[in-house]
């Protein structure tokens, strides 16, 4: 019997009895509210930077990339800290609070440098919360349905990511393109998320209270993260190099002539498809080979980038954004589930911190590079480069399937 067959046989009775914890839904609602707050701001921010503050596309790319790199640097520490102290919720609450408070800087910004500070401060909050939150979700979700759990949280997050741009469009229309007013109103759901988190999430007791050492992380601990874990990290990083910030989708819409008040519609399209796909494909990740599903997602991303590179009309740009959202729904939950399954329970915070660090550094390089390519070669060059890197993931996965030296597939 192969490793995959053994895992499937062992998981079969577990799947029949397993059900999602209420904590998963509450964490999803918290993500929905903060996602709505962020999307109301970020759906307009690239155009705000270019048209109001006079920033270049290169500057937009550097701001987005620097923000993601900052998030990644913080995530590794917060993940390790949550493992060391044996508590997840305090760090999750701290992270959401930092993000909500630091969003006050956006409506006050008078220069691109202030926006950069605001983005970094906001992303520090995201960095503090993400790895402990994902580790908490993994802690309360049985392995057999972990893909479903992450898929549900991503699906609820994308509900907020859809509602945010819709609210921004309505408010921009009613206010006569008053960016700052929209940014002020966007603070409300962000602060609401903190209340839901404090009241609704019940953290389980620490299952390893006697295993904390003098150091938060030791060489022995890293040795427990085996080859399947590092293989998943490598693929996730390469994949992220081809998937830069959605801010470039907004700029693409503005580039083809969409009015500032309506550019968030491109995010509505993307996140609507993402929302519809995340939970079903999260469940699918519990039932089929995850490398195959990642390969399908990579192929969809190649198609999306090729379409966006050549799109000159709103409907083609919208179709490209829809494909972009589909690949996010196909891939997002399965990467998190694969990392959770490959890491020991007491090192899950560390594992997600490493994942987020790798993905964030790759996203920084992708966004900064996309901004430079856009400035000197136009939108087509940025999206074409993304397609090439997404195709590289497909090549890696094919190598994994055909090479005897590659780690075994499955969970």
Put a short name on every predicted segment:
Residues 151-166, 358-366:
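Glycine-rich segments within core transmembrane alpha-helices of 12-TM secondary carriers
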Residues 187-209, 396-401:
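C-terminal membrane-cytosol helix-exit motif in multi-pass small-molecule transporters
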Residues 118-157, 338:
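Cytoplasmic helix-loop-helix junction between adjacent transmembrane helices
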Residues 90-104, 187, 292-307, 387:
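Structural signature of the two symmetry-related core transmembrane helices
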Residues 14-68, 229-266:
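Helix-loop boundary and gating motifs at the non-cytosolic
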Residues 74-86, 172, 277-289, 374:
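Helix-to-loop junctions at the C-terminal end of transmembrane segments
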Residues 5-21, 203-235:
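Juxtamembrane intracellular "pre-TM" segments in multi-pass secondary transporters
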Residues 47-52, 163-181, 365-381:
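Transmembrane alpha-helix termini and helix-breaking/packing motifs in multi-pass membrane transporters
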């Amino acid at each position: 019997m192969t490793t995959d067959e053994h895992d499937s046989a062992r998981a079969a009775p577990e799947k029949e009895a397993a059900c999602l914890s209420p904590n998963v839904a509450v964490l999803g609602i918290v993500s929905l509210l903060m996602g709505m707050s962020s999307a109301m701001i970020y759906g307009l921010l690239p155009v705000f930077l270019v048209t109001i503050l006079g920033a270049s596309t290169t500057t937009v790319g550097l701001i987005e990339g620097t923000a993601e790199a900052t998030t990644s640097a913080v995530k590794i520490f917060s993940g390790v800290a949550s493992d060391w102290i044996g508590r997840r919720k305090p760090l999750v609450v701290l992270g959401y609070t930092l993000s909500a408070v630091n969003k006050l800087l956006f409506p006050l910004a008078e220069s691109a440098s202030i926006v950069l500070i605001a983005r970094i401060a906001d992303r520090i909050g995201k960095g503090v919360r993400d790895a402990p939150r994902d580790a908490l979700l993994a802690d309360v979700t049985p392995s057999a349905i972990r893909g479903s759990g992450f898929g549900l949280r991503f699906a609820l997050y994308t509900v907020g990511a859809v509602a945010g741009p819709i609210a921004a469009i309505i408010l921009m229309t009613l206010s006569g393109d008053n960016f700052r007013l929209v940014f002020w109103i966007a603070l409300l759901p962000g602060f609401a998320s903190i209340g839901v988190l404090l009241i609704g999430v019940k953290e389980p007791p620490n299952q390893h209270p006697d295993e904390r050492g003098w150091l938060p992380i030791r060489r022995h601990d890293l040795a427990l993260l085996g080859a399947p874990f590092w293989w998943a990290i490598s693929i996730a990083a390469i994949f992220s190099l081809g998937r830069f910030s959605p801010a470039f989708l907004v700029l693409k819409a503005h580039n083809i002539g969409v009015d500032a008040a309506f550019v968030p519609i491109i995010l509505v399209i993307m996140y609507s498809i993402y929302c519809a796909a995340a939970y079903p494909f999260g469940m699918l990740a519990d039932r089929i080979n995850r490398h195959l599903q990642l390969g399908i997602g990579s192929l969809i991303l190649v198609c999306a980038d090729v379409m966006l590179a050549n799109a000159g009309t709103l409907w083609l740009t919208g179709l490209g954004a829809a494909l972009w959202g589909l690949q996010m729904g196909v891939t997002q939950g399965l990467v998190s589930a694969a990392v959770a399954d490959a890491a020991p329970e007491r090192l899950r915070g560390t594992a997600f911190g490493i994942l987020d660090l790798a993905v964030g550094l790759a996203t920084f390089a992708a966004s900064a590079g996309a901004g430079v390519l856009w400035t000197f070669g136009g939108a087509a060059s940025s999206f074409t480069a993304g397609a090439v890197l997404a195709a590289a993931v497909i090549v890696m996965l094919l190598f994994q399937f055909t090479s005897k030296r590659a780690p075994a597939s499955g969970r």
